[in-house]
């Protein structure tokens, strides 16, 4: 049973790492954490793995390089996803080779983000805290806005309804720009991530 619990925890951690490093908002969250480290709003030993316990200064000296790495990865993710979205939108004009190339570009950008996470040496617990934050600040507002948009679309047109619908759509577009994937893929991916995260937490409590 103990082996089974350890295996479930390992599977959850691996899946959480993989799935959280697919989103376009993830590099920004990592940069926010680096800012907190630099401003001493977060304890070093809570954020960074034991590898740097005896060499904190060396890690802090790398902060500018880490930020540049994350900015590059964020740009790469956004550009790759924009290219894929454009081809999918004009699928009739796109060749299978172009689509495969764009999909590969997105996958490569996500692989680069996963590698960036490893280079940052953040603890697993910190990654899970960021998942909680994304759940509160991105996922829940997103599905709430989607549901409200559906409700308003079914109502009769009025000044109040039209104004609220326009505001909801504007806020949804702002959130969509942070995802790095289609809304449907985001919901599916985040829900899978969240379920995996909870399985790992439940296994640890046993």
PLM features: what roles do these ranges have?
Residues 1-206:
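Transcription initiation cofactors for RNA polymerase, centered on bacterial
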């Amino acid at each position: 049973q103990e082996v089974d619990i350890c295996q479930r925890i390992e599977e959850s951690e691996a899946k959480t790492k993989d799935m959280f490093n697919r989103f376009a908002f993830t590099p920004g969250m990592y940069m926010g954490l680096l800012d907190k480290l630099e401003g001493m709003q977060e304890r070093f030993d809570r954020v960074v793995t034991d590898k740097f316990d005896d060499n904190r200064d060396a890690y802090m000296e790398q902060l500018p390089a880490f930020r540049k790495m994350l900015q590059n990865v964020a740009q790469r993710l956004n550009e790759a996803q924009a290219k894929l979205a454009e081809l999918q939108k004009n699928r009739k004009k796109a060749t299978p080779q172009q689509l495969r190339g764009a999909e590969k570009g997105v996958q490569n950008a996500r692989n680069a983000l996963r590698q960036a996470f490893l280079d940052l040496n953040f603890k697993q617990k910190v990654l899970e805290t960021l998942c909680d934050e994304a759940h509160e600040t991105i996922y829940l507002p997103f599905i709430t806005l989607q549901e409200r948009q559906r409700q308003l679309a079914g109502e009769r047109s009025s000044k109040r309804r039209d104004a609220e619908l326009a505001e909801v759509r504007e806020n949804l577009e702002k959130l969509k720009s942070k995802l790095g994937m289609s809304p449907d893929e985001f919901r599916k991916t985040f829900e899978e991530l969240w379920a995996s995260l909870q399985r790992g937490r439940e296994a640890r409590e046993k």
